[in-house]
Amino acid sequence: METPIAEELAKKQKSISVAEFFEKNRQILGFDSAPRSLITTVKEAVDNALDACEEAGILPDILVQVERTGPDYVTVIIEDNGPGIVREQIPKVFAKLLYGSRFHALKQSRGQQGIGISAAVLYAQMTAGRHTKILSKTSPTAPAHYYELMINTSTNEPDILVDEVRDWFRPHGTQIELEMRAAYVKGRRQSIYEYLKATAIVNPHARITLIDPDGNEEVFERATDKMPEPAEEILPHPEGIELGTLMKMLHYTERQKLAPFLRYSFCKIGLLTAEEICKAAGLDPEIDPHALGRHEARKLIEAFEKVKIMAPPTDCLSPIGEDLIYRGLEKETTVDFIATSTRKPAVYSGNPFVVEVGMAYGGNLPKEEKISIMRFANRVPLLYQQGGCVTTHAVEDIKWKQYGLNQPGGGIPVGPVILLIHVASINVPFTSESKDAIADIPVIKEEIDLAIKEVARKLKHYLSKQSNLKKRREKEIIITKVLPKLAAKVAHVLEKDVPDINPVVAKIMGNLLVHRVIKNNGDGTVDVAIKVKNFGTSAYSFRVHEMLPCKVSGAKPEPKVVTMGNDYDYVWDISASAGSSKVLSYKIESASEEELQKLPQLIVEGIEEELVTGAKAFKGV
């Protein structure tokens, strides 16, 4: 009797392991080209290093080294000073997909699924046929454990080739070495260098060193010794929970009554709120949750929407903060203006999130190109699929002309700008498993829009101020060309010395006048008065610096003194309201006429140079 076709087909059907699936679909995880495969590998290892260091409270010190081992092959070594990994866990952490500690944790973290670094190990063994080398140490008194591993794709279990103890100079940390088919590229936005530079900006507490295949070393120094606030794990929030998820929670709970189940399974539900939800759902608070079916679960979800429940807590998030975004941009860019904004936390589908934006303008940034958008999710740079990301869509939808930037044909504006956008959440809604772009969630897009507009308004104010200062500068240039000639002619007619025109220029311009008046007492001593007069309509707070090669006496008011080699910097902190005058005085015990003529120009710190007459000026930070 002939075997039915259905039975023949059934013999061919079998399950596959997750490792086999990703072995044949590696592009899903970001291993679709030689350059990108290397970036993805470095990204996964650096993410793990940063997460481990932060959880242990250690300031990260990370080394990334890339070596060419053939025309199409590289070896990449990533080393960190983190807490290390205990011996028993090393094979599973690096050679078993979907193995990790963060998948069920509701808090902000870089990695979550437990796929990333194992996928890199899988890619290395597929393309180079090589095992991965791992060295890890947990304390100065413990030995370092060395493994050589591969992944058994049939079982998704680690194959251990070498397991031994070694000496290692580090007190604690982890090193991973992989050889793979990949390409190291330079001069592109999508490169190892740009990825690490972007990582350094949003992780200013980290020190990252890159050694490229040519042996060149680039160090991204940390800008702060302050660790980020640790993110706390929270319970799920009832807003946006799906029916199947709730049914699973009801089935597996250890609680025997519905009200306690609600209270201890969700955040922001207390005893009174739990009873109110039960009442709204028409369910007995004493009923056993295990007895509830699909119909009752749907009633609970409807009750969640009816009852007012507080928003989820936000201590599960760890935003960078405006000050550290500023420092990160300042450290890695050369610009004239930086503005930052951190929004208040918001919620989508029960998931807390926060949006942060930084904007850098001017300096050596290209003026005729589209602005550079730096996208981040949970402090991780997003280098690919910019056009499919909600951050880009938010940028394109803003009318940039009203903020001082050209936007020919709409879309991304043109100008010397870096726009940094960071979305932090316990569950960032990526568009794919490769985590390249954030999905178009309306509330997230709205928060991005508001944060961008906040820094854009600051840019508009800065550009307006710069335009006014430029006009003042042009006016002052004309005045300082005409007045000296006029003063010289009048002095010649009257047969007098040419007067100092600075007070006249300051009065015409409405500037702050700062000038030095010297009186030689004839006994070898000199009285010096620094006269300050505010001819403007605004109050100013600033510092006056007097750099001298000698010590002074009798200074009033008493200045702060900074020794700089053989010179002394005398510093006065001054506040001058509109129309007010100040006098700073001191005495020099002995000085010749020649020395007095060589006194350096006074310096005013804290005011633009266009607003000061008679002294050098700089705005400062």
Curated annotation (Swiss-Prot):
GO terms for biological process: DNA topological change. One of its GO terms (molecular function) is ATP binding. Signal peptide: none annotated. ATP binds at N48, D80, S101, R102, G111, Q112, Q113, G114, I115, G116, I117, S118, K435. The keyword Nucleotide-binding applies. Keywords: ATP-binding, DNA-binding, Isomerase, Nucleotide-binding, Topoisomerase. It comes from the Archaea. It catalyses: ATP-dependent breakage, passage and rejoining of double-stranded DNA. SMART domains: HATPase_c. Its EC number is 5.6.2.2. Pfam families: HATPase_c, Top6b_C, Topo-VIb_trans. Relaxes both positive and negative superturns and exhibits a strong decatenase activity. Belongs to the TOP6B family. Homodimer. Heterotetramer of two Top6A and two Top6B chains. This is Type 2 DNA topoisomerase 6 subunit B. It comes from Methanosarcina mazei (strain ATCC BAA-159 / DSM 3647 / Goe1 / Go1 / JCM 11833 / OCM 88).
